[in-house]
């Protein structure tokens, strides 16, 4: 994982500030963002009224925004145009988002259903309601589009199921939709599509339930409407084979497609849609033989409609053109004479006392013959449509039981025409049932649940349409359907008599306030408005049965496909009344209610803005009427006063137990109390205010959706954090293994005398490169110094160095990488040194900046210096660490940089560019910007209080260093194993123990204390405890860590996110490393028992001199203004306390009253003489004697450490740790 650090103030000045360096983005004018019009959720209206709702919908419609919420209910206004809001890009933007993160959209409803199905293992459904032409079918198609895209699974079978589900749309639209006066693609049947999913939330099947096809449309339509789409598609785009075989003509040639005077529609391309229909048939799996039979029967229906009648001499019906029934007989594969007889005659049977009587053949008049002809066409099409639905289900059937389902209801909308008959009663009855479900689940059930759960609640009045549903479907008292069935049973032979009987029976339902009788018409006051129905022909439509003569004719067909459409054998002796159309629609509606009630519903309420299908017209009066009958105002009020989410205690705990450490551990449920108490515990531990929830008797109620989304987000992040924790542990383990292997390899090379030969050669080439022209630092000359090059591990393939390379997009091999500093100019102020990372590859030298942006570490490539542009590298002749890579030309000028490994950088630069010149002199000349030359002079001084160089106003003060002709010391050799002076070896470190710092770590020693870096105060080194009495001069081997490593620790702490577990663990890790341990006795484990008793311990040393005050007082010589959050501003003459002194020129100071603390430049301070007197020394104790002995031993070891180092790499490191801080006056 990436290493992060605390965010500090923005770095001041600089020629190229890193993008996103602040937590707050720069304010910009969002010209491309679409302006919000109105409110996106009607619950946010300042005034709740039907007029205010209508006005808000109008504003959004005119702005091209068609979707609005009422809580979780979506309001959709039909735009009658393509708004471009259903593209793949828009769809992708809604994946994984809750409804508050994105604008209202049908995709958001689909995402919510799919997420709830996966998360709560509950079946989902969406109920789309509204009047005809409001956009219900389009909404259902878009939900299917989203679910097919968002659902998981990439196997061929799952993808095939998705494609087949989408293919049901064009197929069922062709056979079940038609052009009406109000809608060019009106659904003339109801469809409930259930998409079935497995346990992985992948679609594995589907099932379609069909409701009440309007088969009367096959034989007649009102003016300017059309038959079902498939007839026009087939008549216009049939293949030549079908035209010659089935006698297909243009739609104008058929009575059933041309009588209404509309065969073409603007915006509908019948030829192109016929191709889509054929493609859908092929995709679903209809064979060519099945398609041929299907189109053969469609041709038969068209030709049946062309059979016309004339009166014979007896006034009965006779066929006008005999060739038409002959061709119909050819298509139906029956005898032509049988066809003529079936449509012109009827077999009547008399009975006496329950016994069969005489059989008569009764001739039909023209009206009766036309009715029989139309019944034949309607029966064939109705059964053909049912076969298509069943065949689609057969292809979509899941191979195994589905775990969960998502249901999509697309059903005809509420209809009010000038002339309304039985079809409109059935359609409006189904819409009443859907409205009843909506009221039951969103209004009544919700308020009843509040009362049952004892939740504080103010009841809200609403209209319950159950009284209207009872008016239509009830048996006692009898409703309209019951009266219809009684009329059909009483006067079944004469349709006119049956209609009269029905008028008389309607007097029994006249008591209902929502019913009015008007002569041969009646009015039902529906929730959507008053509708007047015509009684004429209503009982005949309710019978919904084919004459037995027709059934016998069809079952004698030589076409097995046609026979299979009418599988029930004709029982001529059965006297029982078959189910009527009202019985079927009532049963279907109740089954639909049962299915929908078993799932968690979502709602889409569609609104039709005008009756002219205009994309710009908004009929306020018509929309206001829809707002009223849809009950949107009551819905808004209940939503504002209610709760967004409710769940039983058990299911809530099962879902969110991970949010509390008291209820779960490692994903297991550990709570021992009740589910009620566990729910309270989870809500408290998650930080949910008590005002955001109420506890019922069996359920918890969450008031706002924001609270629920917050709980869900915290639950998702729990899994993310657990995965990150496992990844960190694994990476720590791999890093530890690698480090152990490296230590073993290094030790083995050391024993064989091969340790760092290549690095030593590089180091020695550095001496030759300088050529005695530059003073050296002490640490540059020690025997253990190696030129490693890639100190950050950029070539390792993992770790922080690899992370840097990926962030700046560099893949080349790295020759040199190290941390350093950059001298950054500031307008009107002194320049400042800012920490940077330097990376050298074969082609470029990179200056990389790291900053905190929105609590995330942001790495940017600040400067790229091409190696080919570098003319020479400039350095001073003193022991400082400044250098400059001078370029032939650069728009940003040359950069003055500081790096402790500048000699090694020069060597590596010579490797990648052999001809580069290394210029060493008393000053560094460079170009601050293009055409502006500058120089920095270097002066040696012995009065500098800091141990590093100091830059000020173009001049650098440098302490004296080693002579220029100095070379590295020899690598120390290990002692013999039996040496008395050797330190006892320590046991190997465990996996979590601290690791020995590498030489590259010293490069971090200076930069973290500079202005602009965001590090905490540098921890003080702890005093070593006294050694054990039996230890023999081993105090130096067990002392504290070297100063360079102590300087390194604040940098690591500043890069680690303090909120993460990793940061805390890293801090503990370094503290554990700093804590010195007492030396262990060497007698029992490593040497035999002495022959004589051990000599008594030496007498305790005299008390040490009084220590200096813990926090000496200093006075400020100049004003200093802080440049970072970790710095302290001081005024000239102000006195401060110094708690930590660092070698790099920065001291940790705090106000005299302790109110503020921060880093301040040491050069600005002067110690105040005669500070507070030190407290008297404590009386010597045994512990004090041990401490004195330990100090004496440490001083003795200091004298010996320059002569002999410990055996092996471990002893060498121990020897380094034994040096007091006063000797660490130099870095590498």
From Swiss-Prot:
Residues 776-962 form the TH1 domain. The gene is MYO1. One of its GO terms (molecular function) is Arp2/3 complex binding. It holds the Pfam family Myosin_TH1. Residues 405-487 are annotated as: Actin-binding. Type-I myosin implicated in the organization of the actin cytoskeleton. Required for proper actin cytoskeleton polarization. At the cell cortex, assembles in patch-like structures together with proteins from the actin-polymerizing machinery and promotes actin assembly. Functions as actin nucleation-promoting factor (NPF) for the Arp2/3 complex. Residues 1-27, 953-1040, 1053-1109, 1169-1228 are annotated as: Disordered. Residues 37-716 form the Myosin motor domain. The modification Phosphoserine is found at residue 358. Keywords: Actin-binding, ATP-binding, Cytoplasm, Cytoskeleton, Hydrolase, Motor protein, Myosin, Nucleotide-binding, Phosphoprotein, Repeat, SH3 domain. This is Myosin-1. One of its GO terms (cellular component) is actin cortical patch. The myosin motor domain displays actin-stimulated ATPase activity and generates a mechanochemical force. The tail domain participates in molecular interactions that specify the role of the motor domain. It is composed of several tail homology (TH) domains, namely a putative phospholipid-binding myosin tail domain (also named TH1), an Ala- and Pro-rich domain (TH2), followed by an SH3 domain and a C-terminal acidic domain (TH3). Residues 1064-1092, 1180-1194 have a biased composition (Low complexity). Residues 1093-1106 have a biased composition (Pro residues). The keyword Repeat applies. The lineage of its organism: Eukaryota, Fungi, Dikarya, Ascomycota, Saccharomycotina. InterPro entries: Fungal_myosin-I_SH3, Kinesin_motor_dom_sf, Myosin_head_motor_dom-like, Myosin_TH1, MYSc_Myo1, P-loop_NTPase, SH3-like_dom_sf, SH3_domain. One of its GO terms (biological process) is endocytosis. It is found in: Cytoplasm, Cytoskeleton, Actin patch. Belongs to the TRAFAC class myosin-kinesin ATPase superfamily. Myosin family. Residues 1109-1170 form the SH3 domain.
């Amino acid at each position: 994982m990436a290493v992060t650090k605390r965010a500090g103030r923005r770095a001041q000045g600089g020629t190229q500030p890193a993008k996103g360096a602040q937590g707050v983005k720069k304010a910009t004018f969002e010209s491309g963002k679409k302006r919000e019009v109105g409110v996106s959720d009607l619950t946010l209206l300042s005034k709740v009224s039907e007029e205010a709702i209508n006005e808000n919908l109008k504003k959004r419609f005119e702005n091209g925004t068609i979707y609005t919420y009422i809580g979780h209910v979506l309001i959709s206004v039909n735009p009658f145009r393509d708004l471009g809001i259903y593209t793949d890009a828009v769809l992708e933007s809604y994946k994984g988002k809750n409804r508050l993160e994105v604008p209202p959209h049908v995709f958001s409803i689909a995402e919510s259903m799919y997420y709830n199905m996966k998360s709560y293992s509950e079946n989902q459904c969406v109920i789309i309601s509204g009047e005809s032409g409001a956009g219900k079918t389009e909404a259902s198609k878009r939900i299917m589009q989203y679910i097919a895209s968002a659902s998981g699974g990439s196997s061929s079978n799952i993808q095939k199921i998705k494609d087949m589900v989408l293919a049901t749309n064009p197929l069922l639209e062709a056979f079940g939709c038609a052009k009406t006066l109000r809608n060019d693609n009106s659904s003339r049947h109801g469809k409930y599509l259930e998409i079935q999913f497995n346990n992985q939330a992948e679609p594995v099947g589907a099932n379609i339930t069909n409701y009440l096809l309007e088969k009367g449309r096959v034989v007649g339509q009102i003016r300017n409407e059309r038959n079902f789409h498939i007839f026009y598609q087939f008549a216009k785009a049939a293949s030549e084979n079908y035209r010659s075989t089935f006698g297909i003509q243009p739609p104008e040639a058929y009575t059933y497609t041309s009588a209404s005077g509309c065969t073409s529609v603007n915006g509908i391309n019948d030829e192109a849609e016929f191709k889509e229909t054929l493609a859908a048939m092929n995709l679903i799996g209809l064979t060519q033989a099945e398609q041929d039979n299907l189109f053969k029967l469609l041709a038969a229906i068209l030709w049946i409609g062309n059979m016309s009648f004339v009166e014979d001499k007896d006034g009965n019906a006779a066929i006008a053109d005999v060739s038409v029934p002959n061709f119909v007989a050819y298509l139906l594969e029956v005898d032509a004479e049988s066809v003529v007889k079936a449509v012109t005659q009827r077999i009547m049977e008399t009975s006496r006392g329950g016994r069969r009587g005489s059989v008569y053949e009764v001739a039909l008049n023209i009206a009766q013959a036309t009715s029989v002809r139309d019944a034949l066409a309607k029966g064939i099409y109705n059964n053909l449509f049912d076969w298509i639905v069943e065949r689609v289900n057969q292809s979509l059937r899941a191979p195994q039981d589905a775990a969960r389902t998502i249901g999509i209801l697309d059903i005809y909308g509420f209809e009010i025409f000038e002339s309304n008959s039985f079809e409109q009663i059935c359609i409006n009855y189904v819409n009443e049932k859907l409205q009843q479900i909506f009221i039951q689940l969103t209004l009544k059930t919700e308020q009843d649940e509040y009362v049952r759960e004892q939740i504080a609640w103010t009841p809200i009045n609403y209209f319950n349409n159950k009284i209207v549903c009872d008016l239509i479907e009830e048996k006692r008292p009898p409703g309209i359907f019951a009266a219809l069935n009684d009329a059909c049973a009483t006067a079944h032979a004469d349709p006119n008599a049956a209609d009269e009987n029905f008028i008389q029976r309607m007097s029994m339902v006249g008591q209902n306030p929502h019913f009015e009788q008007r002569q041969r018409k009646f009015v039902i006051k529906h929730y959507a408005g008053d509708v007047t129905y015509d009684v004429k022909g209503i009982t005949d439509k309710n019978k919904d049965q084919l004459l037995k003569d027709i059934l016998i004719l069809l079952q004698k067909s030589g076409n097995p496909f046609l026979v299979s459409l009418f599988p029930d054998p004709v029982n001529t002796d059965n006297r029982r009344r078959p189910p009527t159309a009202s019985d079927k629609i009532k049963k279907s509606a109740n089954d639909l209610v049962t299915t929908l009630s078993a799932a968690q519903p979502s709602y889409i309420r569609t609104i039709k803005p005008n009756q002219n299908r205009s994309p710009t017209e908004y009929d306020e009066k018509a929309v206001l009427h829809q707002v009223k009958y849809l009950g949107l105002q009551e819905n808004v009020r209940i939503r504002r006063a209610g709760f967004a989410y409710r769940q039983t205690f058990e299911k809530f705990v099962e879902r969110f137990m991970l949010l509390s450490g008291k209820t779960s551990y490692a994903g297991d449920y550990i709570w021992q109390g009740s589910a009620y108490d566990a729910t309270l515990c989870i809500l408290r531990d998650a930080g949910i205010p008590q005002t955001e929830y109420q506890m019922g008797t069996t359920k918890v109620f969450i008031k706002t959706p924001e609270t629920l989304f917050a709980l869900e987000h915290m639950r998702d992040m729990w899994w993310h954090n657990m995965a990150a924790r496992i990844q960190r542990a694994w990476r720590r383990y791999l890093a530890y293994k690698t480090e152990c292997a490296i230590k073993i390899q290094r030790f083995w090379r050391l024993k064989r005398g091969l340790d760092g030969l290549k690095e030593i050669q590089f180091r020695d080439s550095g001496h030759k490169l300088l050529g005695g022209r530059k003073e050296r630092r002490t640490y540059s000359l020690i025997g253990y110094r190696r030129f490693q090059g890639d100190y950050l591990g950029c070539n390792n393939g993992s770790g922080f160095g690899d992370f840097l390379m990926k962030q700046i997009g560099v893949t080349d091999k790295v020759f040199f990488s190290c941390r350093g500093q950059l001298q950054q100019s500031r307008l009107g102020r002194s320049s400042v040194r800012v920490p940077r990372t330097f990376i050298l590859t074969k082609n470029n030298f990179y200056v990389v900046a790291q900053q905190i942006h929105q609590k995330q570490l942001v790495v940017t490539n600040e400067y790229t210096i091409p190696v080919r542009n570098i003319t020479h590298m400039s350095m001073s002749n003193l022991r400082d660490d400044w250098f400059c890579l001078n370029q032939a030309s650069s728009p940003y000028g040359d950069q003055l940089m500081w790096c402790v490994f500048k000699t090694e950088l020069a060597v590596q630069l010579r490797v990648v560019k052999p001809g580069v010149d290394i210029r060493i002199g008393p000053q560094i000349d460079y170009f601050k910007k293009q055409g502006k030359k500058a120089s920095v002079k270097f002066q040696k001084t012995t009065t500098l209080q800091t141990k590093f160089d100091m830059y000020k106003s173009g001049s650098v003060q440098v302490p004296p260093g080693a002579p220029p002709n100095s070379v590295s010391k020899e690598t120390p050799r290990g002692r013999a194993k039996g040496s008395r002076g050797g330190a006892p070896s320590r046991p190997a470190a465990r996996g979590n123990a601290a690791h020995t710092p590498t030489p590259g770590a010293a490069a971090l020693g200076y930069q973290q204390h500079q202005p602009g870096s965001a590090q905490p105060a540098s921890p003080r080194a702890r005093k070593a405890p006294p050694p054990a009495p039996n230890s023999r001069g081993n105090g130096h081997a067990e002392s504290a860590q070297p100063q360079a490593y102590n300087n390194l620790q604040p940098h690591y702490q500043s890069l680690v996110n303090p909120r993460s577990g990793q940061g805390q663990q890293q801090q503990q890790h370094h503290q554990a490393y700093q804590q010195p341990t007492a030396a262990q006795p060497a007698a029992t484990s490593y040497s035999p028992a002495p022959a004589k008793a051990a000599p008594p311990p030496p007498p305790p040393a005299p008390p040490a001199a009084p220590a200096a005050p813990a926090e000496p007082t200093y006075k400020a010589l100049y004003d200093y203004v802080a440049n970072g959050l970790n710095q302290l501003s001081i005024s000239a003459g102000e006195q401060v306390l110094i708690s930590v002194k660092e070698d790099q020129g920065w001291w940790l100071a705090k106000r005299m009253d302790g109110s503020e603390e921060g880093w301040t430049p040491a050069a600005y301070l002067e110690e105040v003489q005669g500070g507070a007197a030190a407290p008297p020394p404590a009386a010597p104790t045994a512990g004090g004697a041990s401490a004195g002995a330990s100090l004496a031993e440490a001083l003795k070891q200091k004298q010996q450490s320059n002569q002999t180092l410990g055996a092996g790499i471990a002893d060498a490191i121990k020897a380094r740790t034994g040096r007091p801080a006063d000797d660490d006056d130099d870095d590498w």
